[in-house]
Amino acid sequence: MSQSLIRLSEVQRRTGYSKAWIYRLLKESRFPQSVKIGSRAIAFVESEVDEWVNQRIAESRGEVA
């Protein structure tokens, strides 16, 4: 299974959240874990972020099992 990484700027675009809010969610373990890709760089597993977004949509529409 091939997994793609996306950078923080792409996560911001997909979620509409600021960098600070994403970091807050990470700290509170309410967002998919980041992957360290360099000494000062992180990325996220694209499929995990997509699933997280889909879960938020389902929750807002009362579709949670």
Regions found by a protein language model. Give the residues of each.
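Minor-groove-contacting beta-hairpin "wing" of winged helix-turn-helix DNA-binding domains
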Residues: A41-V45
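Polyanion-binding surface elements
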Residues: M1-W21, E48, N54-I57
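DNA major-groove recognition helix of helix-turn-helix
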Residues: L26, V53
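Short intrinsically disordered terminal tails
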Residues: R61-A65
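Nucleotide phosphate-binding site architecture
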Residues: P32, D50
